[in-house]
Amino acid sequence: CKSAETPTEERIAEETPTKEKIAEETPTGETPTEEMEAGDANHKVQSSKFNVQSKVAGQTIVMLKNTHQAHVMIGTQAYDVNDDRRMPLYLLNNMLGGPGMNAKLNLALREHNGLVYTVESTMVAYGDTGTWSIYFGCDEHDVKRCLRLVRKELDKFMQKPLSDAQLKAAKKQIKGQIGVACDNRENFALDFGKSFLHYGWEKNVDRLYEQVDEITAAQIQAVAQELFDKNRLTTLIFK
């Protein structure tokens, strides 16, 4: 059994993609165009708990994998299980790329334009940090167009708060999804177990409904403005 090797700062620096490396891996030999970039490659996202900085925040990284279609992931560091902003992100994520057919990204990329078969957004909260990301697969020649459409949907949440009707509908939908999910006893048990490990008490579905009801449009917009900042997002493209 080999012992785990702790990466040195020099090794981390060597393995971190640079703009020159990205340019080499881009078919044109140039850095991605402004249309494809998520933001300033020099921008860094810092964890408030561990003083960890992301060296790829704001970059678009293209990896040539000779795949049948392009696989694209856009993401950033998000919130841990104890962060008050987690619940607004929970609702926002469901509206943007949740399992519902009316999810904004599904409508924009699949239903209205037929560019993808699968598109989804995901949030994961850990004990000390969290992640939020978007994934979609499309034909290679449609990547730029898909990225523009994704950016357009993100900007909508950043620029304008939800109306009372939109917020009410979103809450009603996610509470319905929670109710249906409770019928899956295995996932229900696992979820309750995680809650007990993190908080020391079992999850209460009625309390979860109350937390959803407490979410405001202003909270959702604030989370969108923080996480959807193009200088914060990293884009990874396999094609």
Give the residues covered by each predicted segment.
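M16 family metallopeptidases and their MPP-like homologs
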Residues: V72-Y79, N106, R110-Q159, D164-E214, ...
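Long, charged low-complexity polyampholyte tracts
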Residues: Y90, Q225, L236-I237
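His/Glu-based metal-binding/catalytic segments typifying zinc-dependent metallopeptidases
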Residues: E9-E10, E14, E24, G29, ...
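Short amphipathic C-terminal alpha-helix that caps PH/PH-like domains
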Residues: C1, L92, V150-L154
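Low-complexity, intrinsically disordered Gly/Pro/Thr-rich segments
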Residues: T216-Q225
